[in-house]
Amino acid sequence: MLISLSQWLQLLYPEQLGFLRVFQYLTFRAVMAAMTALLIGLALGPIVIRRLTELKIGQPIREYGVAEHMVKQGTPTMGGALILLAIAISTLLWFDWSNRFVWIVMIVTFGFGAIGWVDDWRKVVDKNPEGMRSREKYFWQSLIGLVAALYLAFSVSETSNLRVLELFIRWVQSGFSNDLPPKADLIVPFFKSISYPLGVFGFIFLTYVVIVGSSNAVNLTDGLDGLAIMPVVMVGSALGIFAYATGSSVYANYLLLPHIPGAGELMIFCAAMAGAGLAFLWFNAYPAQVFMGDVGALALGGALGTIAVIVRQEVVLAIMGGIFVLEALSVMAQVTWFKYTKRRYGAGRRILLMAPLHHHFEKSGWKETQVVVRFWIITMLLCLVGLSSLKLR
């Protein structure tokens, strides 16, 4: 919004307001987006926490979980709404409203946030321990993921919504041909000439898995004070760098990345997400004053997945978000093995002391803060590995 306002003012007063040209610089707007989201989060945080406390929107704690967590019973939850509010205000202020990629990321983010809101509301306010039924939650996640995947399948190779529509019509008229331009290939990091053609349906399937999988993986990771939000900030910031490089024809050609016009504007969203995340961490650090809840975790995970798909870095996302991947795999392995052994031996057996993975380490004797900080360190290292793929090819 501010970029359009600055352009209008420059047309009216070109000599007096020439300094407003700074709004054209993507890096300047990204820094300002991060600062804006950070300040909004810090300013509104105490108000949101106080309001959640007054409404008695407190986090229920499982009795069969980690015993030390019982002291967290009643800590305000649904604080993810604060993150989303800060992201929304900051992004709307600083990004170019004509950019379709930012809009699709925001739609996915707030769509998943709405699912998380309903789930949290049923758990905390309606006192329904199940929240949304798994099938109901998965249906809505799948609907949003598939719609986004279908749009992005024709969007990454085109420069406008009109051309996206034209490409989609040609695809339908061709009898749903599986051909797709090279920009929709699966890119293998660290290799400059290796990529795998996905085709329309392959791209849609991969995009669906990445978006929905990322959303649920971040949600599973959000189990300790500050555990999920800092990796989200790190991975989101790294993806912002990929977005900047991918959106620039100069950097994309130099780094052998697919050039996707308009993708650079996603750096604004990534910066806002980082700023909002740091503001939330101020209140979510041990001992947490507020939890983000599903409204925050599902939304942020969906955002990371969508951005990674747009900048064609799905594999790099899996590397940088390795903690999220391990947390999700730990739950899948635990549940699968338990069901298998129960069916075969009559009694279920466990691979881990408790899933997700962070609870296993707690049960093993690690302090909560040790688990959190060590997972942060691992994520930092993985992000550096992911960023190194920009040049190491």
Swiss-Prot record:
Names of the cofactor(s): Mg(2+)
Alphabetic keyword roster: Cell cycle, Cell division, Cell inner membrane, Cell membrane, Cell shape, Cell wall biogenesis/degradation, Magnesium, Membrane, Metal-binding, Peptidoglycan synthesis, Transferase, Transmembrane, Transmembrane helix
Annotated GO CC locations: plasma membrane
Transmembrane feature ranges: 29-49, 75-95, 101-121, 138-158, 193-213, 226-246, 263-283, 290-310, 315-335, 370-390
Membrane topology: Multi-pass membrane protein
Domain of life: Bacteria
Principal subcellular localisation of the protein: membrane
Similarity comment: family membership: Belongs to the glycosyltransferase 4 family. MraY subfamily.
Keyword Iron tagged: no
The encoding gene: mraY
UniProt organism field: Methylibium petroleiphilum (strain ATCC BAA-1232 / LMG 22953 / PM1)
Name under which the protein is recorded: Phospho-N-acetylmuramoyl-pentapeptide-transferase
InterPro entries: Glycosyl_transferase_4, PNAcMuramoyl-5peptid_Trfase, PNAcMuramoyl-5peptid_Trfase_CS
The protein's annotated pathway: Cell wall biogenesis; peptidoglycan biosynthesis
CDD domains according to UniProt: GT_MraY
Function of the molecule: Catalyzes the initial step of the lipid cycle reactions in the biosynthesis of the cell wall peptidoglycan: transfers peptidoglycan precursor phospho-MurNAc-pentapeptide from UDP-MurNAc-pentapeptide onto the lipid carrier undecaprenyl phosphate, yielding undecaprenyl-pyrophosphoryl-MurNAc-pentapeptide, known as lipid I.
GO terms assigned for molecular function: metal ion binding; phospho-N-acetylmuramoyl-pentapeptide-transferase activity; UDP-N-acetylmuramoyl-L-alanyl-D-glutamyl-meso-2,6-diaminopimelyl-D-alanyl-D-alanine:undecaprenyl-phosphate transferase activity
